[in-house]
Amino acid sequence: MASHDHDHDHHHHHSHDDGDHHHSHHQDGSHGGGGGSWVGEDGRVWHSHDGLAPHSHEPIYSPGDFSKRAPPLISRRFAERAFTVGIGGPVGTGKTALMLALCRSLREKYSLAAVTNDIFTKEDGEFLIKHGALPEERIRAVETGGCPHAAIREDISINLGPLEELSNLCKADLLLCESGGDNLAANFSRELADYIIYIIDVSGGDKIPRKGGPGITQADLLIINKTDLAPAVGADLAVMERDALRMREGGPFVFAQVKHGVGVEEIVNHILQAWEIATGNKRR
């Protein structure tokens, strides 16, 4: 099992799906605090933001392939942290609305808890509490600072801590983790998410699926949201379907209108199927 030291006093090293990442954590704080960048001993350019440990990013040379996506971790102990669903996607595509819809669909039969990521606020967590998605004690809001993708990939401890705490506190069956809004290159580490959902919407036009990026090509499930807006923005859903199938090599995707409940049942079925396979449990 992949392990993380939540203390972060000094160097630690852990393996991610596409290579090793070395995080240099300086005791003297010389590279923390207000940010900045520098060249590390490994030759990579490192940077830091308020609230996050120094980190570097692996260069991305291609959008990736669905068939070559990182598999779920074999040695996961769900007694230590429940099956975790990662929900990523650009700002405004409907991640928080999906979190709310999933909570409403699953909370009667399953013990749930949720962690939200925002860059400088706790707005998404507060939204879930305000709308009664789950009891307040089952929700944690994390402020990631200016590099939201690091919190779901390079320096996941900021999310692992709350997820593990909630998992034990709530005896959770499922954990939901919403990333901060980011670009098409951002995707979850398998050390954090057992099942990865990436959500885009049609407001950017029908070109988005073919632009690719790890989220679109390698998420376990792609959601194309707000299909009701297609006529207004001139997006052709047939083109989006064709491109999604091609970019994802036939991997699953769902057309949805999450706010109106369209496609939510199909999304829930995908999640529960993965949960059953990973945990050996039967859906209720």
Swiss-Prot record:
Alphabetically ordered keywords of this record: Chaperone, GTP-binding, Nickel insertion, Nucleotide-binding
Renumbered residue ranges of the record's region Disordered: 1-51
Pfam families named in the record: cobW
Biased composition (Basic and acidic residues): 15-29, 41-51
GO molecular function, one term: GTP binding
UniProt cross-references to Gene3D superfamilies, sorted A to Z: P-loop containing nucleotide triphosphate hydrolases
Residues bound to GTP: 89-96
InterPro entries: CobW/HypB/UreG_nucleotide-bd, P-loop_NTPase, UreG
Physiological role: Required for the maturation and activation of urease via the functional incorporation of the urease nickel metallocenter.
Subunit record text: URED, UREF and UREG may form a complex that acts as a GTP-hydrolysis-dependent molecular chaperone, activating the urease apoprotein.
NCBIfam families per UniProt: ureG
Protein name: Urease accessory protein G
Gene encoding the protein: UREG
